[in-house]
């Protein structure tokens, strides 16, 4: 089953030329399990994205995307993970998230946050549901100054609640992994 993902998919950093394909993937799930993303937002954040590229045919095809966003000195967020329905269930999303987790470890981030409906998927990577806000009051006050929606979602601020209903806030503690 994962043979498909291993042999025909390359995980790599996104490039400017991938942004429209990332938008296509995000639009597949927008309004249901992902928040909509404007094209300009994707261009502004392309450096945070990684893609899964199908390499067994020409032209090569972007079949999944995901981003790692740094929220604080000890906290990152996995965001905007989308897998093309044609390859769902074949391990592509797992390979992509594994790559984002490895990148977070390389950056020295001890914790990773995700806001998701896909709790079983992320639980397989060690993410656990959280309640409250696992940061000190001083860090909370500093993070409140951010205009980033992901920070507001992590802090569970009231103004983002209408956009996050039904989602689960989950945390992976990389510093506790063996």
What are these language model-derived features?
Residues 1-36, 53-54, 61, 165-178:
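Short amphipathic alpha-helix that is part of the acyltransferase structural core
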């Amino acid at each position: 089953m994962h043979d498909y993902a291993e042999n025909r998919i390359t995980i790599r950093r996104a490039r400017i030329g991938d942004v429209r394909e990332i938008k296509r993937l995000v639009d597949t799930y927008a309004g249901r399990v992902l928040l909509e993303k404007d094209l300009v937002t994707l261009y502004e954040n392309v450096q945070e994205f990684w893609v899964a590229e199908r390499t067994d045919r020409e032209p090569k095809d972007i079949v999944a995307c995901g981003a790692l966003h740094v929220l604080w000195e000890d906290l990152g967020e996995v965001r905007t993970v989308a897998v093309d329905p044609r390859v769902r269930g074949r391990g592509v999303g797992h390979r992509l998230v594994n790559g984002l987790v490895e990148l977070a470890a390389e950056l020295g981030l001890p914790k990773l946050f995700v806001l998701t409906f896909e709790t079983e998927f992320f639980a397989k990577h060690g993410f656990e549901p959280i309640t409250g806000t696992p940061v000190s009051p001083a860090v909370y006050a500093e993070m409140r100054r951010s205009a980033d929606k992901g920070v507001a979602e992590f802090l569970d601020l009231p103004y983002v609640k209408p956009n996050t209903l039904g989602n689960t806030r989950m945390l992976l503690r990389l510093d506790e992994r063996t």
